[in-house]
């Protein structure tokens, strides 16, 4: 079966730049990679075809030979040069596949924030801090205890027994990665012997057993600013896990979680609460005290107030942590129906009900609803 033109395989023009070639190849590699298409022979063949095309066209000398003589110019069996599999001037597939694998798995190779071998940054930590509403609104100082990894003191974080030191890994030569040949291309992976550090411990420290770090719990003081809310994060720089091989320490992120309040519900900078009132206060009007985070305030209830009526107390909400004026407190009225009535109270209510008969002006919503019901059944 005749081979397809390499430019056609990659879907580019003959005069395409190196960047365009790389972009086209990366797109095809992502699409047809075996990890994305398990047990798909067609995709596997397309992947190999794209790999072969890119290895030729990304090498200046091979590309020149191909442009002049076609496949014969690069096929060793026909006297062409090079072949495939990575001579010194071959394509740098490790860079491309590093990008491809990053897209597959959501991160770079080697993990942890370090480079190839050598020092690596310590991991960041997360601590969930529970606060009540008053603490979140006003701010507070809290001591927390966090389990973490710190540098081993006897070996000063090297992992090697005192008087000795780590040695260069003979498997990877101190790089921390090894190259694996897979068909037409080679990829790099973490060295299985040194686990990416580039060095090995021949005489490990007795305290940390060669790890260079030990577990320890630290007590830290956290200053919580006023106005924080659930999901807000406070970063404590350098309070995460210690790095390895002398790498920098990670950070600690304190994540705020505000517990539910018995009276108030919070929505951003505004607070909400339900205010129960008697039906007599609702009908006749009155004045009552309602709670706020700053103490009690008087709320005037106009006569004829209905359940669901909302009263706004301006500035009685929360001042946001990122600045701006305080929000409001929204008071939702809930009219209570009296229970456990005495005989005299029932008599008075009966008299009151009788006095309302045939006078719909006292209950405009109810009269309108009943009129709607009558029209509904009249239309059936």
Swiss-Prot record:
Cofactor info, note text: Binds 2 Zn(2+) ions per monomer.
Ranges where the J domain occurs: 5-70
Predominant cellular place of this UniProt entry's protein: cytoplasm
GO CC, one annotated term: cytoplasm
SMART domains per record: DnaJ
PROSITE patterns: DNAJ_1, DNAJ_2, ZF_CR
Binding site for Zn(2+) 2: 169, 172, 191, 194
Pfam families with a match to the protein in the record: DnaJ, DnaJ_C, DnaJ_CXXCXGXG
Reported cofactor(s): Zn(2+)
CXXCXGXG motif repeat extents: 152-159, 169-176, 191-198, 205-212
Amino-acid positions noted as binding Zn(2+) 1 in the UniProt annotation, renumbered to this chain: 152, 155, 205, 208
Assembly: Homodimer.
Domain description: The J domain is necessary and sufficient to stimulate DnaK ATPase activity. Zinc center 1 plays an important role in the autonomous, DnaK-independent chaperone activity of DnaJ. Zinc center 2 is essential for interaction with DnaK and for DnaJ activity.
HAMAP family per record: DnaJ
Protein name: Chaperone protein DnaJ
Organism listed in the record: Pseudomonas savastanoi pv. phaseolicola (strain 1448A / Race 6) (Pseudomonas syringae pv. phaseolicola (strain 1448A / Race 6))
Source lineage: Bacteria, Pseudomonadati, Pseudomonadota, Gammaproteobacteria, Pseudomonadales
Gene: dnaJ
């Amino acid at each position: 079966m005749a081979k397809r033109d390499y430019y056609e395989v990659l879907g580019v023009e003959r005069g395409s730049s190196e960047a365009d070639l790389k972009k086209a190849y990366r797109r095809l590699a992502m699409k047809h990679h075996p990890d994305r298409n398990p047990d798909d022979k067609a995709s596997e063949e397309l992947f190999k075809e794209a790999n072969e095309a890119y290895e030729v066209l990304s090498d200046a000398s091979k590309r020149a030979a191909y442009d002049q003589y076609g496949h014969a110019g690069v096929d060793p069996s026909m006297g062409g040069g090079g072949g495939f599999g990575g001579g010194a001037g071959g394509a740098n597939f490790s860079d491309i596949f590093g990008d491809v694998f990053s897209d597959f798995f959501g991160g770079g190779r080697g993990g942890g924030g370090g480079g190839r071998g050598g020092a690596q940054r310590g991991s960041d930590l997360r601590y969930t801090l529970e606060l009540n509403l008053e603490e979140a609104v006003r701010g507070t100082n809290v001591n927390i205890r966090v389990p973490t990894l710190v540098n081993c003191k006897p070996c000063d974080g090297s992992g090697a027994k005192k008087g000795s030191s780590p040695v260069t890994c003979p498997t990877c030569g101190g790089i921390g990665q090894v190259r694996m040949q897979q068909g037409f291309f080679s990829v790099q992976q973490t060295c299985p012997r040194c686990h990416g550090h580039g060095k090995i411990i021949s005489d490990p420290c007795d305290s940390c057993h060669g790890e260079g770090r030990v577990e320890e719990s630290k007590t830290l003081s956290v200053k919580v600013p006023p106005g924080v809310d659930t999901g807000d994060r406070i970063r404590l720089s350098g309070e995460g896990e210690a790095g390895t091989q002398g790498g920098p320490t990670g950070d600690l992120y304190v994540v705020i979680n505000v517990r539910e309040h018995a009276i108030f519900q919070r929505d951003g900078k505004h607070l909400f609460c339900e205010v129960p009132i008697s039906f007599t206060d609702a009908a006749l009007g009155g004045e009552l005290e309602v709670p706020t985070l700053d103490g009690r305030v008087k709320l005037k209830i106009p006569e004829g107030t209905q359940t669901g009526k909302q009263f706004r107390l301006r500035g009685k909400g929360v001042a946001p942590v990122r600045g701006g004026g305080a929000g409001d407190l929204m008071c939702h009225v809930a009219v209570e129906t009296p229970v456990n009535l005495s005989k005299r109270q029932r008599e008075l209510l009966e008299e009151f009900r009788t006095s309302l008969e045939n006078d719909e002006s006292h209950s405009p919503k109810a009269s309108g609803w009943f009129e709607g019901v009558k029209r509904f059944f009249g239309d059936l």
